UniProtKB/Swiss-Prot annotation:
Keywords: Chromosome, Phosphoprotein. The lineage of its organism: Eukaryota, Metazoa, Chordata, Craniata, Vertebrata. Interacts with DDI2; probably also interacts with DDI1. One of its GO terms (molecular function) is DNA binding. It is found in: Chromosome. InterPro entries: Rtf2, Rtf2_RING-finger. GO terms for biological process: cellular response to hydroxyurea; mitotic DNA replication termination; regulation of DNA stability. The gene is Rtf2. Undergoes proteasomal degradation, via DDI1 and DDI2. Removal from stalled replisomes and degradation are required for genome stability. This is Replication termination factor 2. It holds the Pfam family Rtf2.
Amino acid sequence: MGCDGGTIPKRHELVKGPKKVEKVDKDAELVAQWNYCTLSQEILRRPIVACELGRLYNKDAVIEFLLDKSAEKALGKAASHIRSIKNVTELRLSDNPAWEGDKGNTKGDKHDDLQRARFICPVVGLEMNGRHRFCFLRCCGCVFSERALKEIKAEVCHTCGAAFQEEDIIVLNGTKEDVEMLKKRMEERRLRAKLEKKTKKPKTATECASKPGTTQDSAGPSKVKSGKPEEADPDPREKKSTPAPRGAATNGSASGKVGKPPCGALKRSIADSEESETYKSIFTSHSSAKRSKEESAHWVTHTSYCF
């Protein structure tokens, strides 16, 4: 039964029993929640933001998380409910004048007071170290202790004067029950926002359908009608064969819009038109452009102007 050296093992050393639950140091847990970022595990530094579940983050860490949503991140579950920068609120914190920070114990020969906090409640003066419940308002981001809101009941923020409702109050680092309640509110708020977006889309569609004339006019540039109105013609074939009036051509050129002739339009000769002789002399069909065989050059010296 004995081992080397005359030692005798006891029963609890040999028999395996159920594992004991590891006890977490409450002071260390409070320091981690109120002084370190939930996402990056770094010391909280301004600007400090809080999510809809009441967790504290560094704003830089949240932006980096949103830009790089890779599966390799170990702490992605802590911020999986944050989909955009609009889901977090920047906090307005009041500094604690009694907090010395790292300057108080530079040599390491003094006791560090873990209960001393960087921020306090601006109304009551309680330190934000986890011993007292704190909350913030979604509308403005001001942070107060829960005792201040209970003692001074008002529908207006004590610091900036912004109006708020009970749904805007979010508890910082609350219990499991508080987190479940805040999660339900968050889901209801997001569903309400989706329904509002869906109701807005049909309204815009009905407004556009009620005004068809304005949409057609705005779709393209306005067309200016030039010339005299066309007279009613019983026979459409005669209308195709007749040439276009001279006034309509001049008006079309003056308005700056040159339209293509229709497919069924007949080609007309410039020599038969009623233009002036100087205008006709430009074209090769004019009598001045025609040359006799004697005036034209032979096959060696011919140019393109001879034809």
